[in-house]
Amino acid sequence: MSIARITEISSTSKKSFEDAIQSGVARATKTIRNVRSAWVKEQQIRIENNSIVEYQVNLMITFVLDEGNQADLA
């Protein structure tokens, strides 16, 4: 039996939503082991002087806990 956990992260990009997603997943996998999936919970843009200056995504990252860490949920 495996147990998964979900954590929410926020990522930004000056290029696009796709770049914000890629950057967020890349950063999450540097410190979270066993990442299995991610879904975009929210998307936002920041506008200055009538132009988009930043894309932001909130991602829900799902990862499977190591056997030794499953007690952490108790």
Model-predicted regions and their roles:
Residues 21-24, 47-52:
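Noncatalytic linker/hinge segments flanking ATPase motor cores
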Residues 2-36:
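Short, well-ordered alpha-helical segments
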